[in-house]
Amino acid sequence: MAELATVARPYAEALYQVARQGDVAVWVEQVSALAQVAENAELRQFAGSPKVSAEQVYDVVAAAAGVSLSTGVQHFLRTVIDNGRLAVLPAIAVQFNALVNAASGVADAAIFSAYPIEPAQLAEVVAALEQRFGRKLSVNVTLEPELIGGIRVVVGDEVLDTSVKARLERMKVALSA
């Protein structure tokens, strides 16, 4: 995984340098769509076939993305395909999004909850978390029933775990000590 990140970094940085000259949000949408397509194992197998030209791979990926690609993103996709880096595209998208978020003062937050969170509750939780972490958060909520109750929040390398499972584990450690 580390080698994917190493290969992806220069692409993501170059992509960000070009994207910030225009509408970054459009670039994020298009690159995310391409990354989703590139995660498909059958597509990567097709792209790796020596019988398939780079132009054919480009046509299939661009069509499968389902969004109209700007000229800059088209050039980026051609470069990635020509360099045989289609499999790295999801990692490039992750690093590109991280650069965009860092520049705008936003951090990605993963919220794991035992139960579905209502939109009003989520808004309250996000407001409290933004105050606690001191920055705007882009939130992704995932259901994780094994937490029993409460939530676990991951922002960068910081973890805030208020789940029942974590409390029970702390009690177990305290009682066995």
From Swiss-Prot:
UniProt-annotated location(s): Cell inner membrane
Protein family: Belongs to the ATPase delta chain family.
Protein known as: ATP synthase subunit delta
Keyword Cell membrane carried by entry: yes
Location, primary (coarse class): membrane
Lineage per the UniProt record: Bacteria, Pseudomonadati, Pseudomonadota, Betaproteobacteria, Burkholderiales
Pfam families for this protein: OSCP
A single GO cellular-component term on record: plasma membrane
InterPro entries noted in UniProt: ATP_synth_OSCP/delta_N_sf, ATPase_OSCP/dsu
Native source species: Leptothrix cholodnii (strain ATCC 51168 / LMG 8142 / SP-6) (Leptothrix discophora (strain SP-6))
